A protein has these predicted regions:
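Asp-based, Mg2+/Mn2+-dependent phosphohydrolase catalytic module
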Residues: 1-10, 100, 116-117, 121-216
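N-terminal helical cap/lid subdomain that shapes the substrate entry/recognition surface
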Residues: 4-97, 118
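Short, flexible active-site loop motifs that bind/organize anionic cofactors or intermediates
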Residues: 37, 71, 85, 110, ...
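Substrate-recognition element of Asp-dependent hydrolases with the DxDx(T/V) motif
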Residues: 76-90, 95-127, 136-139
Length: 216
């Protein structure tokens, strides 16, 4: 059972917890390969296979999240591609209301994200999620992704965190596992299905809205 006192730090991922991950999926699976194919006059399916192969190679590293890496690799401007789209990012169902409820608490609140800072700042122009948090801590600035213990050392120092009195929320199981290994006492995995507690102590909730309803 999630326990929250007045000083418990609330640490949350962004994409897949607060914002709908479909937006990012469309970038990687549609917008980016279509742009590269049009620009290079290459077969779209071949480009998709090439990009997916590199994604699989870089997954869990900073390169995977760093749009500068993909700019250089594919000779594109990822942010220009994103800005050209009519579609904008959106909140997951119930997450905006959940943030409004959490905002009534005086607890310290921070976003911890692997996402590229430029992309996340652009998303904040559309959905002002930053108003609900004290800060946003980027793995790009830390120099390590959330999958690595070094990220957590820097996050603890920079945000003055007590891992014994913190809740971390994420939708990526590898990140969730990394958080438990560095000693965060309460780790929440946002994943479909019934609420349950895993063997490593991680507690699951289907959504941020479900978690918020359980603690407020």
């Amino acid at each position: 059972m999630v326990k929250l006192n007045s000083t418990t730090a609330i640490l949350s991922d962004l994409d897949g917890v607060i914002l709908n991950l479909d937006y990012d999926i469309k970038f990687w699976e549609s917008w980016l390969p279509e742009h590269v194919a049009n620009q290079s006059n290459q077969n779209l399916e071949e480009i998709k296979i090439k990009i997916q192969a590199e994604i699989d190679t870089q997954r869990g590293t900073l390169n995977f999240y760093d749009l500068n890496y993909w700019d250089d690799l594919l000779n594109v401007d990822c942010m220009e591609i994103i800005r050209e789209q009519e579609e904008k990012c959106s909140y997951l169902e119930g997450s905006h209301e959940a943030l409004q409820r959490l905002s009534t608490l005086k607890n310290p609140k921070h976003i911890l994200t692997n996402g590229d800072p430029r992309a996340q700042e652009y998303k904040a122009e559309t959905q002002n999620f930053l108003e609900f948090f004290d800060s946003i801590f980027y793995s790009m600035h830390a120099g390590y992704p959330k999958e690595q213990k070094e990220f957590w050392t820097l996050a603890r120092h920079n945000l003055n965190l007590d891992f014994e009195n913190a809740i971390f929320i994420d939708d990526d199981f590898k990140v969730v596992t990394a958080a438990t290994k560095v000693g965060i006492k309460q780790v929440i995995w946002i994943t479909p299905g019934k609420n349950r507690v895993l063997q490593n102590g991680v507690e699951t909730f289907p959504s941020l809205a479900d978690l918020t309803a359980a603690i407020i």
